[in-house]
Amino acid sequence: MIRKYREADIDQILDIWLSASIKAHAFVEAEFWASKVNEMRDVYIPASETFVFESDNQVAGFYSLYGNTLAAIFVSPKLQGEGVGSAMLDDAKSRRECLQLTVYQENTPSINFYKKQGFISLGEQVDERTGHPELVMEYYC
C-alpha cells in the first residue's frame, strides 16, 4: 500500500535511501552518501511531498516529489525487482501531469527503468556535488 510519509517512517526511509544509494551508485564513494544522511533527514525529506510503499507494516520504498520533480525514488535493495518501484512511479504519475528527474548516466538499470515507464531524455548535466554526469528526463511535460 502507498501512503503519505509520517515522521515515524524517517529511520526506515533513511536506511533505504543509504543502502539503495550505495548499491545503485557504486561509482560514487559510499562515504559521500553516508555524509548526506543528516541533510536528507533535515532538509530534503521535510521540503518534499513524500510517499511510502508499505508492506507487512514495514517501509519497502519511498518517493519524494518537489513540485513536478521526482526528487527521489528508492526501493529497499532486498525488494528491488518485485514491482515496488513501478507501483510507486505509477502513483507519482497519478499525482502530477508531468514529471522531471535527473539520474546518473552510470546508473544504467535506473535509466532503463525510467525509459520503460515512458520517460524520455531531455539532455545532460553534471551533478555539482559528485562531478558525475546526469541525464535530465521527463514524463509528459
Where are the language model's segments positioned?
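A short beta-loop-alpha structural element at the N-terminal edge
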Residues: 1-15
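Conserved acetyl-CoA-binding loop-helix of GNAT-fold acetyltransferases
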Residues: 81-94, 112-116
